[in-house]
Amino acid sequence: MKKVEPVNFRELDKKIKKFWEENDIYQKVKKKNERNKEFYFVDGPPYCSGAIHLGTAWNKIIKDTYLRFKRMQGYNVLDKAGWDMHGLPIEVKVENEFGIKNKKEIETKIGVKQFIEKCKEFALKHKEIMEKQFKNLGVWLDWENAYMPITKEYMEIGWWTLKVAHEKGLLTRDLRVVYWCPRCETALAEHEVRGEYKEVYDPSVYVKFRLANEENTYIVIWTTTPWTLVANLAVTVHPDYDYAYVEVEFDDKKEVWIIAEKLVEEVINKAKKFHNIKNYKIIKKVKGKELEGIKYIHPLLEENERQKEFAELENAHTVILGEHVTLEGGTGLVHTAPGHGEEDFEVGKKYNLPIYSPIDDEGKYVEGKWKGVFVKDADAEIIETLKNKGLLVYAGKIKHSYPHCWRCKTPLLFRATEQWFLEISKIKDNIIEHAKTVQWIPHWVETRYINGVKFVGDWNISRQRYWGIPIPVWVCEKCGKYIVVGSVEELEEKMINKDEVGEINDLHKPTVDKIKLRCECGGEMKRVPDVLDVWFDSGLAPYASIGVKELKKADFITEGHDQVTKWFYSQHALSAIVFNDIPYKKCLMHGFTLDEHGDKMSKSLGNVVNPDDVVEKYGADLLRFYLLSANKVWEDLRFVWSEMDDVLSLFNTLWNAYMFAVNYMVLDNFKPDEKYFEYLKDEDRWIVSRINSVAKIAIENLEVPYFHTYTWTLKDFILNDLSRWYIRLIRDRTWKEKDDADKLAAYQTLYYVLLKLATILAPVAPHTAEAIYQNLKTEDMEESIFMNKIEVDEEFIDEELERDMAIVRDVVDAIYRGRDRIKYTLRYPLKEITIAGGEEVKKAVERFEYIIKEQGNVKNIKFGEVEGSKYIIKPNYRELGKRYRSEVPKVVEALNKADAKELMERLKEGAVILDGYEIKPEYVEIRLEIPEHIAGVEFSKGTVFINTEITDDLIKEGLMREVIRRIQAMRKDMDLDIEEKIKIKVEGIDLDEFKEIIEREVRGQFVDEIKADYEKDWEIKTPNGEKYNVKIAIERINK
């Protein structure tokens, strides 16, 4: 053991990291456990698209804390780090670097090959940056063997997975309405869009469609996407709803509008804002099914010639039926464009309507009046056109939730395109059953996950992009047949232009795009141009990360709540397809990090907290502890800088306790030896019991994991059990003679407790714990704290002792509160206290009377009732009056004759009969009346009564403590060592009878003549109002 100095936790981080690196500690820990039971962890991969943020820091700290615990429990932890390196997150960043404004410029400005190379460079560069940041947080993972989806081996397993899906009939190419990003020019999957809805303002337009065969009669529709009216092919009504023919008089004309009956008033009120409506009335009512087949004239027929062709079709421009129609706003008649809405698409197929989507990849019209115009830019002109045609009922704005691209944040479009899908709908029931086998933390995530699966559609896995795993599908240009290639070996066997392509070392575009295969029909097969959804990449992780084609269930995974419908789902979906099972056993969902006001952190708001800045100021361990203790990890975390100061205070308290203990041990050349355990006092046995109880709680809660209970338990032990209680109890014992058994027992207790505390603390605060361990360990101990197990010495746990001490601490706390109330500081002794309570309290007080006296500074303790006190009965006249009315005086007379204390005890059991009257507890208030010089303070199991009388002797003793405190403060100012002796001289107060005590407490010697190195004047005020002006002089003996 070496003397401990005050700590800078950031510098401590660096020192311990250096120790770990120089001694290869991580590898030695893995080596120690390599033959033990395996624990398989799959790292949810962060995107290599920039520096880490507080959320990713929290995520890795959760993982690292749990895995450190598992290693310490002896498991052979498989802990590969993982990275997400494909997809739009990287592409968008690289586009920004090159000033690329749209997808076409990738090919025209720099070319696909260079773009792919730059994406790879970007991903690898930021992988290194982020890895360094994670290491800065103290995160131990297998960084050297991290899994990267850009490797040939990983991508090949992706191909194999898709081929299995194909062989099982779960892969299909189909024309469907999908989410489409016009900026990235690609389709997106449903799960990518969940959580990406934002509140926006869009047009709110009510439009009339004139019926073809009924004069002056119109159906009224409502839409927030006027641009889709260009592609309208039908109007849908609910077959069972009531619809009204409404005769409307307005603007000097009369028309009939067809509107759902329940929405007539709402629609007319909207119309009044645009038209001078004089009168309206319902002239006819029909069911929705009676409207089926009614033809209307398309409102933009002249603006889009294609609509004239559609008008010739049987079901186009007609009213059709659909169960999806609601009466929650709008008109009850739904504008239907099968090429631009999922429900529109389904109902359109039912009526054999064309799947018409007249827009290109950039979201621009490809025909008609607005050809070449971005659809959203056409909204205003379309509305104006409708107005000019007399078809506009109302136009305004509406604030609603609308999906955006998860990477570039552009509002998405709904667009019918041909895409590749995994038909999850066919195995959805299996997926739901699998989910029920997982241990979800918190448990309600299971319901959230299953509900998400119930509503999820087939997985659109194709992306019209570049940087990703190419879809391994080759299509024959002659017959249209396609094959799915499952490996490089298979590809090399079937390729017909090997000489042109050469050896296949990279599976990215454009390399694989050059490869041609021969079809059975003799035609040439080319690869489809799409790449796989990046969530397909991460979904492969449970088996592709370790390079196997078999199910290996992860023992533990954890990610933020946005991943419930993303990564938790994507890896499950793929494993369900390939292995018919779920790839993880335990899944913890954590929250998001927010600013102190609960707002999302963003650069534009200027509220981003950089984890590197926090670590630089406080050290990694303090950030780690804060993030795991601020609240339950599944709740969103509000980061508050001032709360980091609270954690700093906690760790300083821990370090000060450690420094206090070790520096006294070093001073006395203490050598730990279990033989000193035979000299333990009750307070020593108590703290030993407590640290083992804490270890037990820690193990139980880390196993779940419930990090909040684990960290809160540690905090309570450090602050309340160790620092504020045990060290206070044994402080005087450290000043005894060097070989005193009582002192050595205290040292051995502190040594044992600090060593075990460091072990318990190690998962969350690895640097601090390692530093403490390295100074406490003996030659026969393990090289690192992480080669030790968190263990519980059950034989040392004494629950009765812990209960007794808890009562005593409550009593002492009550004394402190009483002192505050009567303004009588702890330095002045109390003449006497009386403690009232049950047998449990009496036993604890008798056992630890010496502690109560010492810690409460009390001269005498009694148990029971206070002399001169009495219980009195106060009738509750309001309650008595309700029951007994005119007989209340007789009831009060009966109460006055009763024994108050006896009545109080009887009322605890329920109602009591006095002189024939029923007395309920609410009829009376029974309270204890105590003498004026007694102050009563309640605690959890009783009351402490403090005798507040002050005597001269009590004041003198208090003054002695006042002087000791001031001499100690002056020693601190002088920066004296603990053992350094001093000469002292005190003027202005007579303390001759306490000289020996003062000399012992301050390691000093009173002298008459002094050459002061430091002197100071003090004013001391006593509780009885007296003032003393005291001069204290100190001279160092060893100068």
Curated annotation (Swiss-Prot):
CDD domains: Anticodon_Ia_Ile_ABEc, IleRS_core. ATP binds at residue 603. One of its GO terms (biological process) is isoleucyl-tRNA aminoacylation. Its cofactor is Zn(2+). Pfam families: Anticodon_1 (PF08264), DUF5915 (PF19302), tRNA-synt_1 (PF00133). Its main location: cytoplasm. It is found in: Cytoplasm. It is an enzyme of class 6 (ligase). InterPro entries: aa-tRNA-synth_I_CS, aa-tRNA-synth_Ia, Anticodon_Ile_ABEc, Ile-tRNA-ligase, Ile-tRNA-ligase_type2, M/V/L/I-tRNA-synth_anticd-bd, Rossmann-like_a/b/a_fold, tRNAsynth_Ia_anticodon-bd. A motif ('KMSKS' region) lies at residues 600-604. Transmembrane segments: none annotated. It catalyses: tRNA(Ile) + L-isoleucine + ATP = L-isoleucyl-tRNA(Ile) + AMP + diphosphate. NCBIfam families: ileS. This is Isoleucine--tRNA ligase. The gene is ileS.
